[in-house]
Amino acid sequence: EETDTLTVKCQVVSVDSRRLTAVYTGSLSAQGAVHPTELFYTNTLDLTLVEDIGLADYGDALTMAAYVKSEDVSFYDLAADRLSAVTEYIATVDEDTLTSIFESADFPLGEDGAWPESFSYERQGTIYLSMPVPHALGDYVIVSFVPETK
């Protein structure tokens, strides 16, 4: 809509001769909406092959889903006042649903052109993975996972 407002900021969080990772955050204020929708997406490019790199290249969806459902889950930059509500919400989502979301994470878009529900990137050995949550909980949370410690 012409009256909607989209704001997106890009931060290059990692770059070297082989790989570039950009994180995009922002919001969409739709006409008539009480609160804006918060946005998060990432893109990691293999600069040698000029191809997208995603969760399937440095982690696996089933492991990440099990981690999100575990008591060990760690969130990146989640306000303390939201932690309890997010944890309660995650308890209502089954592991198969999370696995499916994480299997479709990252670019490129799926065959049907659908925008992924989850985005990820790897930085200094830590995997960061977004997970959709209800609008009242902030639209998404970021899970941080360090494979060596799991």
Name every feature range the model reports, one short phrase each:
Residues 1-150:
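Compositionally biased intrinsically disordered regions enriched in Thr/Gly
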